[in-house]
A protein has these predicted regions:
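RecB-family 4Fe-4S metal-dependent nuclease core
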Residues: 1-200
Length: 200
């Protein structure tokens, strides 16, 4: 509908103006969109496409993940230090440039930039992690989690994580790994394994 389209255009325009202001205040001199990032980890090669990779006049890099909505969800990911997609992009850029970049989420429908610190973006809404850990430590937790899960798979054990399944010793992550997270069932590719209900 015309009104919906007009509203969408207005919010998108405001979001782009705000992002341009953030970029200007940060002294950004280079912006790359849909930037390919490639690297490796103990399991093999990793590759992805970061929404925005920026560099300021001091040569510091930042990777920004653009989201249409989620002004509560994504700050919470930073608070819980569970921004894994950003952490993976950051590690791949670290492998390329030799230093950890800053990370941030930009939520378009609210024109809000969230970051765990203001190192690159001085006007960002800073959301530090509750436990004091940073993106580099999240990456190390991911590696510990990967090693734990690989050892389970190699021994023929595949965990289905559901709220309705009691926690056991085998389903408890090691202390240096990421805590187990129950994902939204709407995005579960393995619902057939997890079971279903007849809603008719």
């Amino acid at each position: 509908r015309g009104a919906d389209l007009a509203g969408f255009r207005y919010r998108l325009h405001q979001a782009m103006r705000n992002l341009r202001d953030q970029v200007g205040k940060a002294g950004i001199v280079e912006v790359q969109s849909e930037r390919a990032v490639v690297g490796h980890f103990p399991g093999g090669e990793l590759a992805g496409s970061a929404d925005l990779v920026m560099k300021n006049a001091r040569g510091e890099h930042a990777v920004v993940d653009m989201k249409w909505s989620g002004s509560k969800k994504f700050p919470q990911k930073l608070r819980d230090n569970r921004h894994l997609q950003l952490a993976i992009y950051a590690e791949l850029l670290r492998q390329e440039h030799g230093a950890w970049p800053s990370v941030a989420y930009y939520v378009l429908d609210r024109a809000r930039l969230f970051a765990p610190d203001d190192r690159v973006f001085p006007s960002a809404e800073v959301v530090p992690s509750a436990d004091g850990e940073n993106t580099a430590q999240l990456w190390q937790r991911f590696l510990a989690t990967w090693r734990w899960r690989v050892s389970q798979v190699q021994s023929g054990r595949f965990e289905v994580v559901l709220d309705s399944i009691p926690v056991t010793d085998e389903s408890t992550a090691p202390e240096d790994a990421m805590g187990t997270e129950t994902l939204n069932e709407a995005y579960n590719d393995y619902r057939t394994l997890a079971g279903w209900e007849n809603r008719a």
